[in-house]
């Protein structure tokens, strides 16, 4: 069973995929989106779903530290609703609090990547962490 993890932002969607057995997550890519113009990257997402034979999505929920929901949670849920409609696949949500902070820390401390390069990979790594946290919780 292949599961795709998504870190949905206002300008990009970080994408990760599980291995076929569902044990590990691998960052795939970052899809540029534009909420204002209505471009949500669904064409590219469709290509990835077909290529990896995805069975389920896991979308990160950016809850506030006090466990309340803000506008980005609503945007992530709306994105999840739309991909359910488009792909007819189940969507589950994973708390993503601090995953971007964790991803940035990993890139600085372990990979010593410059700030400019971090921006290019951070959403992909955040998606990988979201998916890996989900997989760890499920198995």
From Swiss-Prot:
Matches recorded under HAMAP family: Nuclease_YqgF
Presence of keyword Ribonucleoprotein: no
Pfam family name, one: RuvX
Gene Ontology MF term list: nuclease activity
Gene3D superfamilies, per database record: YqgF/RNase H-like domain
Primary location recorded for the protein, binned into one broad class: cytoplasm
Keyword annotations from UniProtKB, A to Z: Cytoplasm, Hydrolase, Nuclease, Ribosome biogenesis
Species name: Streptococcus agalactiae serotype V (strain ATCC BAA-611 / 2603 V/R)
Protein name, per record: Putative pre-16S rRNA nuclease
Classification via CDD domains: YqgF
Top enzyme category: hydrolase
SMART domains in alphabetical order: YqgFc
An example Gene Ontology biological process: rRNA 5'-end processing
């Amino acid at each position: 069973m292949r599961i795709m993890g998504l870190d949905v932002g206002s300008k990009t969607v970080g994408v990760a995929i599980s291995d076929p057995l569902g044990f590990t997550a691998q960052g795939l890519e970052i899809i540029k989106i534009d909420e204002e113009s209505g471009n949500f990257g669904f064409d590219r997402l469709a290509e990835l779903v077909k290529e990896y034979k995805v069975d389920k999505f896991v979308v990160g929920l950016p809850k506030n530290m006090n466990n309340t929901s803000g506008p980005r949670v609503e945007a992530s849920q709306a994105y999840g609703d739309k991909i359910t409609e488009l792909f007819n696949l189940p969507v589950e949500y994973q708390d993503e609090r601090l995953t971007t902070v964790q991803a940035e820390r990993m890139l600085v401390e372990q990979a010593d990547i410059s700030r400019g390069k971090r921006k290019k990979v951070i959403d992909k790594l955040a998606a990988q962490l979201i998916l890996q946290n989900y997989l760890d919780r499920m198995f």
